[in-house]
Amino acid sequence: MKTAFVFPGLNGLLRQKDRERYLELPHVIKRLQQAEGALLRDLGMKTDLMGMVKTNTDEIYRIDNISLAAVVISSIQVGVVDHLREHFPNPDWMVGVSLGDIARTVSSGAYDFEVAVVSHVKFTHKIDGIDKLGGNIGVATTLQKPFTNDDFEWFEAQGVDVSVLTSRFLNVGALFSSLENVREKAKDRGWRIMPIIDYPAHSRYIKPYVDASREEFMNVKTMVPQVPIFSTLSCKMLVEPEEIKEEFLETIIRTIHFEKAITTLHKEHGVTRFINIGPCKSLYTLLRDIPLEFQVTDAEDLLASTK
């Protein structure tokens, strides 16, 4: 049985029970402390990441906190993988979605954890102002009313960038005016709208901000992964360090293709078990929505079996 670890993105801390799920795990505590130490040493930032997680959702996702929220999620994810590795074999593949690419790459051995933490915070501070442009929302429909070609043509005409996570769940990044049009369209089509983050991730509109940081980011040391990485951006295996770094940046400004990536792993690479690393259950739900015969497991269940 071939297995893939799957790492969710920035929505990992939206719900209180997700935030609290792994906080008592020793490996998670260690990674949070390690991240705090790296930020203090390299950036002079004194942080209390554990304390931050225990505040409310609005505080955690405040735009000036968003880089630390990302650090917390990545620390939790890497800590969970640390624990799983003490009890189970390595997976055959590592798969990240958006921010999940950080923990994916660290866990694959291609990126040092402390370098990842510091680089992300430095990069995020250099794209200050992107929250003034637009936002990122989830758009869900039902099995009975799937998205149509006309819908996708309408999205394109509105200038929004659509990531197809599954056939009935989209991630939409756009300017504020276009997002308002999507919300109005949703009322007519019976779609459900979920706010995700307050800047237009996975869209063309933040390319100038990303390009301004590209040269410095491309100097970050990256290694050949020890566990294969599969990209939800290009839907292929990533091997070369330069390609891994380039995709980190491209994922921010281009659409991602979760269902296509999972389908390719299953059909072409024989993956029959996908393990959601968490801390949230969003990818667990999306995986179960894909009409293929594979096993979906949550890391929480595996951790429970090790106690």
Whereabouts are the PLM-identified features?
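Helix-rich "cap/lid" substructures immediately adjacent to catalytic or cofactor-binding pockets
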Residues: 2-95
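Short beta-strand
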Residues: 52, 95-96, 161-166
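Flexible, low-complexity segments
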Residues: 14-16, 73-90, 94, 250-307
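Alpha/beta catalytic cores of group-transfer enzymes, especially the acyltransferase/condensing modules
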Residues: 41, 107-246
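Conserved small-residue
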Residues: 9, 35, 77, 100, ...
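Short glycine-rich anion-binding loops that position phosphate/pyrophosphate groups of nucleotides
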Residues: 10-12, 234-235, 280
